[in-house]
């Protein structure tokens, strides 16, 4: 657990681990957190934007538009068929009060806070023995970024430019640092030396 007001950097999940976690959470009837992790990993949205989503925005559609809380910019998200199917499955199991309801509501009927989500994610990390040091809401966005980068490794500069735009970063250097690529490149330099 981190100290109050201290800063820790969220880590990303390996994509296959994230997908397995989404499936395990659903299998264990934890559809709310399964949906949270799926949306975070497949959209790259910040937690504040995920918590603001309502069912009518994401159910039975292949794309939706959000106005990002942090930047005020509009962003259109396309949902792939597997994610659409998972959203429908979660909707049927969660049984929200209506289509206008927020997607992530606590048992008390209020939208989860970021702090509560982070506590839940730490519990998930422990229960499912995730191999990740700092697992928080921001890990989902970083997992999205890392997967987009890894899928486009043959044209990594183009992938970084796309991610820079998606994340609303002012430079590719910021995106590289955000994804932890710079540190990895530095460490690989040491490995490339031979005796």
Region spans (language model):
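DNA breakage-rejoining catalytic core of tyrosine-based enzymes
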Residues: 1-19, 72-81, 100
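Short basic/aromatic active-site micro-motif
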Residues: 131-151
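Short pre-functional
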Residues: 34-46, 63-64, 146-151
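Basic, Lys/Arg- and aromatic-enriched nucleic-acid-binding interface segment
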Residues: 2, 13-43, 154-155
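Catalytic-site neighborhood detector that most strongly recognizes the C-terminal catalytic loop/helix
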Residues: 68-72, 167-192
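Active-site-proximal segment of tyrosine recombinases
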Residues: 49-50, 145, 153-169
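Active-site/catalytic core of tyrosine-dependent DNA strand-transfer enzymes
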Residues: 19, 82-132
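Conserved tyrosine-mediated DNA breakage-rejoining catalytic core shared by Y-recombinases
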Residues: 52-83
């Amino acid at each position: 657990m981190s100290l109050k007001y201290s800063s820790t950097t969220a880590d990303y999940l390996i994509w296959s681990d994230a997908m397995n976690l989404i499936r395990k959470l659903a299998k264990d009837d934890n559809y709310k957190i399964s949906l949270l992790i799926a949306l975070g990993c497949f959209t790259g949205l910040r937690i504040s934007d995920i918590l603001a989503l309502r069912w009518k925005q994401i159910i039975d559609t292949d794309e939706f538009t959000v106005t990002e809380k942090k930047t005020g910019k509009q962003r259109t998200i396309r949902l792939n068929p597997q994610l659409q199917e998972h959203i429908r499955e979660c909707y049927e199991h969660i049984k929200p009060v209506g289509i206008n309801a927020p997607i992530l509501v606590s048992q008390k009927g209020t939208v989860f806070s970021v702090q509560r989500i982070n506590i839940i994610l730490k519990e998930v990390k422990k229960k499912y023995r995730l191999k990740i040091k700092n697992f928080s809401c921001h890990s989902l966005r970083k997992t999205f970024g890392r997967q987009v980068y890894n899928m486009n490794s043959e044209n990594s500069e183009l992938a970084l430019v796309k991610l820079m735009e998606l994340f609303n970063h002012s430079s590719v250097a910021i995106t590289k640092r955000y994804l932890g690529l710079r540190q990895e490149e530095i460490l690989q330099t040491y490995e490339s030396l031979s005796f």
